[in-house]
Swiss-Prot record:
Component of the cytochrome c oxidase, the last enzyme in the mitochondrial electron transport chain which drives oxidative phosphorylation. The respiratory chain contains 3 multisubunit complexes succinate dehydrogenase (complex II, CII), ubiquinol-cytochrome c oxidoreductase (cytochrome b-c1 complex, complex III, CIII) and cytochrome c oxidase (complex IV, CIV), that cooperate to transfer electrons derived from NADH and succinate to molecular oxygen, creating an electrochemical gradient over the inner membrane that drives transmembrane transport and the ATP synthase. Belongs to the cytochrome c oxidase subunit 2 family. Residues 1-14, 88-229 are mitochondrial intermembrane. The lineage of its organism: Eukaryota, Metazoa, Chordata, Craniata, Vertebrata. One of its GO terms (biological process) is ATP synthesis coupled electron transport. Keywords: Copper, Electron transport, Magnesium, Membrane, Metal-binding, Mitochondrion, Mitochondrion inner membrane, Respiratory chain, Translocase, Transmembrane, Transmembrane helix, Transport. It catalyses: 4 Fe(II)-[cytochrome c] + O2 + 8 H(+)(in) = 4 Fe(III)-[cytochrome c] + 2 H2O + 4 H(+)(out). This is Cytochrome c oxidase subunit 2. It comes from Pelomedusa subrufa (African side-necked turtle).
């Protein structure tokens, strides 16, 4: 869940976001070590008067600064490729949900259930119940079953949008006339907030995304309840 003045990642609620967080820490540590090495070399050059006059045939140095960057790039590329594979992997999704972006709300279609479709608008501040998230709460949340693979089909009706949930590690562009795909699984029950992450007009900041994850029996109750509306 987002918090005021937050500078770190939101708590991961999916395996993908956990891997992205680990990859960020891994890459940041490599950058930190390289920065320390460069700083040490600069300080050494500034603080000593010793010079090396025979640099024309420094084959050992050339070998080091060729092989070492290659090793560093490999240590970054391998986990990155693994995460890219996880993003595109589809492992028999439990259901498919289509999200369509409009100015400035979302439409959700549960394609596995007949005539299950609704619009999701942001709740205005003056109508917001006590304790709810300002500018992030909606009148109809997208509800999914817990620990189930969900395939998202994402498109737009008018202009470019982007469907994003930071705690799930998801950010997929919604392009008019095109359908993009994302797959996720949520490992803990809860409510997860996001926003449209593509500038889409005057009310771009008022186009939140809310996903609620429920155990399967509660999800079935939600289906029965929404069918009666």
């Amino acid at each position: 869940m987002p918090t005021p003045n937050q500078t770190n990642f939101q708590d991961a609620a999916s395996p993908l976001m956990e891997e992205l967080t680990h990859f960020h820490d891994h890459t940041l540590m490599i950058v930190f070590m390289i920065s320390l090495l460069v700083l040490y070399i600069l300080l050494s050059m500034l603080s000593t008067k010793l010079t090396h006059t025979n640099t024309a045939n420094a084959q050992q140095a050339e070998m080091v600064w060729t092989i070492l960057p290659a090793i560093i790039l490999i240590t970054i590329a391998l986990p990155s490729l693994q995460i890219l594979y996880m993003m595109d992997e589809i492992n028999k999704p439990h259901m498919t949900i289509k999200a369509i972006g409009h100015q400035w709300y979302w439409t959700y279609e549960y394609t596995d259930y007949k005539e299950l479709e609704f619009n999701s608008y942001m709740i205005q501040t003056q109508d917001l119940p006590l304790g709810h998230m300002r500018l992030l709460e909606v009148d109809h949340r997208m509800v999914t079953p817990l620990e189930s693979y969900i395939r998202m089909l994402i498109s737009a009706d008018d202009v470019l949008h982007s469907w994003a949930i930071p705690s799930l590690g998801l950010k997929t562009d919604a392009v008019p006339g095109r359908i993009n795909q994302a797959v996720f699984i949520i490992m803990q029950a809860g409510i997860f907030y996001g926003q449209c992450s593509e500038i889409c007009g005057a009310n771009h900041s008022f186009m939140p995304v809310v996903v609620e994850s429920l155990p399967m029996n509660h999800f079935d109750l939600w289906l029965a309840m929404i069918d009666t509306l």
